[in-house]
UniProtKB/Swiss-Prot annotation:
GO terms for molecular function: 4-hydroxy-tetrahydrodipicolinate reductase; NAD binding; NADP binding; oxidoreductase activity, acting on CH or CH2 groups, NAD or NADP as acceptor. Keywords: Amino-acid biosynthesis, Cytoplasm, Diaminopimelate biosynthesis, Lysine biosynthesis, NAD, NADP, Oxidoreductase. Transmembrane segments: none annotated. Its EC number is 1.17.1.8. This is 4-hydroxy-tetrahydrodipicolinate reductase. It comes from Mycobacterium sp. (strain JLS). The keyword Signal does not apply.
Amino acid sequence: MRVGVLGAKGKVGATMVQAVEAADDLTFTTGVDAGDPLSALVDTRTDVVIDFTHPSVVMDNLKFLIDNGIHAVVGTTGFTDERISQVQDWLADKPESAVLIAPNFAIGAVLSMHFAQQAARFFESVEVIELHHPHKADAPSGTAARTAKLIAAARKDMPPNPDATSTGLEGARGADVDGIPVHSIRLAGLVAHQEVLFGTQGETLTIRHDSLDRTSFVPGVLLAVRKVSERPGLSVGIEPLLDLT
């Protein structure tokens, strides 16, 4: 399988280039960065592209890849419901193309989201705290937003979080994602971390995941690269690849 990387000179992208080059069953074709022509992916007969770029360019990248029949594994964040809908519309005209978008490729992070979804209905209160390096463009993170949505869906028949706050500074209680408070921290020295805090009578439960290095994303990305062509259309998350759905 011939694999290219968009954002190849970025910190995550460079890690992905090394991972593809080290894999015996994959061939690295080309790396594309800002200012480079996307046509290089076609010229090198690339089968699958790994995209770790920026929310401002990822949609143009996807339109090009879909139009040219190149499968995409996307770790770039910033996907709103509207963006997801747009990708689905593009894919409707290219039924042979496959796009997999995941808010997080770290296996532990995916498992922590799954565990949080399972725990959600057993606790009265829940809040999410995500912590990242200060260069991250979006807040809350895609992982935190997805975690909150999964928790909210699991709690759909439960009362809302108890919270008597009536006054306070704007933003002090975090962002509201489907009724779940999500707090974002940006701090030098961090990579990617998340805590989900549950509370009920007499006890609390914390589910925490830490990506200490960007290589934590490699196993999930390579799994997606190897499997994406088997799932035409749009897939969100790698949970199905791990038999978690």
